[in-house]
């Protein structure tokens, strides 16, 4: 069951391997949040991040009900797994509402993007060099940047990426037939 699909412009910061490149960029990314409920399996929340301008960008993160207590304890979260998807959606919607303001209070930051081909215009290095990618939902105030949530995200598996590219191609073909 797909819960939410949000288009956000987020600030992308260079990863540790690209520490010499201090240029941050804004990109419009789509966050799709899906809650999988299957009999005899734990519920799983999946976050999928795509870039309409670059179809090779596809990041995913999944948190199961069984994994959530560790995330909750590590980050001091106050909600249970049943409430987590709605709170994540609310945080992302807050970021979306702040977009375009001179000094937005809420934002999404992806760091370690050198591990994702195309995200900062480079190709991925070997796994030993290109550490993980972290999505942070942050709030800025006059004193500091507060991280509400940090989730590890990873480039999607090859089969998932191929399905995504096929969907993108299908959309282009449909738009071409419609004359759009």
Outline where the language-model segments fall.
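N-terminal, leucine/charged-rich tether regions that mediate assembly and partner docking
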Residues: 1-166
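Charged heptad-repeat coiled-coil "rod" segments that mediate homo-/hetero-oligomerization
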Residues: 161-180
């Amino acid at each position: 069951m797909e819960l939410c699909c949000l288009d956000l412009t987020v600030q992308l910061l260079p990863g540790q391997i690209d520490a010499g490149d201090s240029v941050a960029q804004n990109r419009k990314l789509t966050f799709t949040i899906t809650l999988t409920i299957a009999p005899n399996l734990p519920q799983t929340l999946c976050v999928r991040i795509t870039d309409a301008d670059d179809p090779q960008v596809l990041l995913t993160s999944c948190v199961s009900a069984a994994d959530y207590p560790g995330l909750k304890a590590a980050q001091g979260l106050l909600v249970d797994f049943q409430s987590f998807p709605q709170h994540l959606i609310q945080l992302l919607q807050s970021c979306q509402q702040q977009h375009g303001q001179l000094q937005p209070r809420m934002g999404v930051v992806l760091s370690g993007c050198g591990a994702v081909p195309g995200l900062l215009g480079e190709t991925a290095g070997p796994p030993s060099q290109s550490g993980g990618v972290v999505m942070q939902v942050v709030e800025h105030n006059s004193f500091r940047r507060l991280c509400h949530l940090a989730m590890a995200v990873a480039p999607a598996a090859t089969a998932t990426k191929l399905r995504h590219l096929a969907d993108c191609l299908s959309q282009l073909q449909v738009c071409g037939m419609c004359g759009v």
